[in-house]
């Protein structure tokens, strides 16, 4: 990087860090986004903080440029945050699995635990190409902790299970976490133990969502809260996930699993699906009165960028959401509970 580019980036990093000062706990144990280059002026770079571990993500750069950029970021941020104990570089555009999952540039091993809203979450920062703990769903974890008391919860596409753990921490009566990967679900089990939660209240199952949903429907199993937070795109022998083209189909697979009066939580992170398109698709599903959009859960400003730090906008307008990660809580009624024009229940 030439001097002008280095000077520009250090200025952007300094400004971003200034606006996140209130999020920097002592001792450091939380998880925050320190810099979102997509929105804050340097698209090849995202910097996250997990307790004392700095995770540097590079995008669309070769190995040499990624390393040079990460070393510059390391030097700049360690001068301001001298308690950082580890720097991990993840090269998202690399063809080498180890480089994508992360190489330690500084310090010892990455942290294995973060705290959020009074809950501990296990980390496995090198398990996958992302960090394994999604910062954009922080608000949803808070909602679950606040609203899941005495509720049964199904967390589909659970990944490392943080949403289900948040529900248990909020007093859920039972949580079922399903994901195709048993390795990812092991992280959920580790989080359960960190919080000394009742292990009998959480069931994990390494199974395809479409298989599990079919089995549950046949058994007439229902849950008070069902969460669908799928990957952007996935194709398995039993089904397809496409967050741009098939949101309605996925919702219709999940809604029979929700109890009458329960909640369906839908997360869509399709970058090129506008907020208006997504909310329009959901509103079309509410026309018969069986579904009601209750809440839109915003993404934290450390992820979206602050008014004073944002330079670039998403490629499509996210409104009425504040980020391409679009989170909606939908109330579900069963057909027998919908009143007819004579104010009688349908039988």
Regions found by a protein language model. Name each.
Residues 1-51:
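Non-catalytic accessory regions of SAM-dependent methyltransferases
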Residues 41, 48, 69-134, 142:
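Non-catalytic substrate-recognition/targeting regions of SAM-dependent transferases
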Residues 209-288, 292-295, 320:
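S-adenosylmethionine
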Residues 150-159:
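Conserved class I S-adenosyl-L-methionine
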Residues 160-173:
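Conserved SAM-binding loop of SAM-dependent methyltransferases across substrates and taxa
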Residues 174-179:
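Conserved SAM-binding motif I beta-strand of class I
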Residues 263-347:
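C-terminal catalytic and target-recognition region of SAM-dependent MTase-like enzymes
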């Amino acid at each position: 990087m030439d001097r002008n580019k280095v000077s520009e980036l250090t200025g952007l990093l300094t400004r971003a860090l200034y606006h996140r000062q209130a999020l920097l706990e002592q001792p450091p144990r939380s998880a925050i986004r320190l810099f979102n280059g997509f929105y804050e002026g340097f698209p090849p770079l995202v910097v996250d903080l997990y307790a004392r571990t700095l995770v540097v993500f590079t995008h669309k750069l070769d190995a040499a440029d990624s390393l040079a950029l990460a070393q510059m970021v390391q030097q700049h941020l360690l001068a301001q945050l001298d308690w950082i104990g580890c720097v991990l570089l993840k090269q998202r555009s690399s063809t080498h699995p180890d480089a994508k999952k992360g190489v330690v540039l500084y310090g010892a091993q990455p942290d294995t635990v973060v705290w959020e809203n009074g809950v501990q979450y296990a980390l496995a920062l090198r398990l996958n190409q992302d960090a394994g703990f999604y910062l954009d769903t922080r608000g949803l974890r808070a909602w679950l902790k606040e609203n899941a008391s005495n509720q049964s919860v199904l967390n589909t596409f659970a990944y490392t299970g943080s949403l289900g753990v948040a529900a248990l921490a909020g007093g859920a009566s039972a949580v079922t976490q399903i994901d195709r990967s048993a390795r990812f679900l092991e992280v959920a089990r580790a989080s359960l133990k960190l919080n000394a939660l009742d292990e009998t209240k959480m069931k994990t199952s390494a199974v395809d969502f479409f298989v599990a949903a079919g089995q549950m429907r046949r058994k007439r199993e229902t849950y008070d809260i069902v969460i669908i937070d799928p990957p952007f795109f996935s194709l398995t022998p039993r089904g397809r996930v496409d967050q741009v083209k098939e949101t309605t189909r996925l919702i219709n697979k999940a809604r029979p699993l929700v109890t009458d009066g329960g909640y369906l939580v839908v997360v869509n992170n399709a970058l090129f699906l506008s907020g208006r398109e997504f909310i329009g698709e959901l509103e079309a599903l509410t026309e018969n009165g069986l579904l009601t959009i209750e809440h839109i859960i915003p993404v934290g400003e450390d992820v979206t960028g602050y008014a004073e730090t944002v330079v670039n906008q998403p490629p499509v307008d996210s409104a009425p959401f504040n980020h391409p990660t679009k989170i909606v809580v939908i109330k579900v009624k069963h057909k027998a509970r919908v009143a007819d024009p004579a104010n009688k229940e349908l039988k």
